[in-house]
Amino acid sequence: EGYLERLIRAGFKVAICEQTEDPAAARKRGGKALVARDVVRLVTPGTLTEDSLLKARAHNHLAALARAGGNLGLAWLDMSTGDFTVALPGLGELPTLLVQVDPGELLVPEPLVEEPYLAEYGSLLTPLVASSFASTAGERRLCETYGVASLEAFGSFSRAEIGAAGAVIDYVLLTQKGRLPRLARPRCQEAQAVMAIDGATRRNLEVLEASGGGRRGSLLGVVDRTATGAGGRLLAARLAAPLTDIAGIGRRLDMVQALVEASGLRGKLVGALASCPDIERPLGRLSLERGGPRDLAAIRDGLECAIALRHLLHEDVGGLTPLPEDLVAAATALGEHNVLIGRLG
């Protein structure tokens, strides 16, 4: 993995070859026959799953830009966690959206490679033939992936968004040799749902990085007291794209206020979360048949933590004002996993 990290950081794509045949079978073909080997994976900057190649508290996005019917569609996937989002930015909004997404790799149709708004992403661009972004093929691929007859259940997507999302799925299938990680349903980010912060403003405000580079001294570095990698990634994503919806902001503030007032419960939750491993990324590796015993143990320990969190949120906390609906929903969604934990134990 040391060599792999160096090559990826330098912008290379790496083909992983493995032995695909038993030596005894090779000998049957002749005394000097070579054991069969094949490429089992292409490692690219946007398709990383190894913890050693990823930042624990930052997403690593594989993004795709498509054009259809005069519109631009952008889709981005964190292959290590399965988070999948699409958006329909105007040409003037695209640079700001790309800064928000901060892709590790950006798939683009060959005709768009020379567009001025992509100039600063030169080293991150992976040009593909225009047919890779066809919306009809993209819709078919998405329906096959999620096992649905149509995409209507997921929301209303433009042809450009579908083309971009389909290109992402196809590229993952190509690099993973026909395998797909665990994927969330594609979520549409509405243009006015989050605040647009352009690159210059983001740098001047030092939202995610300080002027000298790194988190230390940035807004994120100051406010990040999360106990888990997943929590750190969520906080960074929310700071990168602050809500503009008053109702949504109010719901978040209700949850903050409830936990500020319930200091005892808050302390117990922090203690429980501190022992909770990151299970999103182990799940992603296992779904690609790339995980190991350590990943299974992380999922077991994470599920035990989920049960503890669920019980804490349902405890009688001594006269506390009823928890906000979003916290109750989160507690319910944690579920019970005793049988699975037993099997993993």
Please report, for each region that a protein language model flagged, where it lies by residue.
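Basic, polar low-complexity surface loops/patches
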Residues: 1-261, 278-284, 288
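Charged, amphipathic alpha-helical segments characteristic of ABC-type P-loop ATPases involved
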Residues: 273-345
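Conserved interaction-surface patches within small, structured recognition/assembly domains
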Residues: 263-266
